[in-house]
């Protein structure tokens, strides 16, 4: 774990990167005319400033727990790539949960030392996915683990039946779009869930090895 003055020095360097990357995102917003400039300034000073503080807090909580030396982390290319890309993405969301996943990805990029191509793909997927994408992917990793799911009451049915029992607020049309995304991206192994199967099939794991690896990357 990074402690004391060493951690404070490292934290300041990381937060400097956050500041620079955040400003880079802001500078990419086209501004022209007095009204547009005024709106831009309000957004920058309020919503985006709040997001930057949320992101700094999420990073600090996780970085302080890394078991390593300052030099090892500072010289890790995967960590640096994840930090810069995730900072840019954090400015695009107001959801704390999404920022938490991004911060987890930064830490895990160091812990797992993922090669850069896969690292960039995973971070891009995290940018693309909504919280519901991740919720559904986590469900299909292990349907039996979810509270409120009574495995004994089913003999035949569709895996969707269990999902909608656990998450009754899900919209069916939105779910179809989300599940198609997950399938096309190679996160799940079953294309069509509109099928009837035995109870063991209903509760079967449906994430692929790539989907499992992606979940490990964004969770702590």
Task: List the predicted regions and their residue ranges.
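Membrane-inserting effector segments that mediate pore formation, membrane fusion
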Residues: 6-58
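N-terminal leader segment of winged-helix/HTH proteins
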Residues: 80-111
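Long, helix-rich, hydrophobic modules that act as membrane-proximal anchors or helical bundle/coiled-coil regulators
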Residues: 99-220
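Short acidic/histidine-centered micro-motifs embedded in hydrophobic/aromatic stretches
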Residues: 38, 42, 76, 86, ...
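Amphipathic, membrane-active segments
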Residues: 45-89
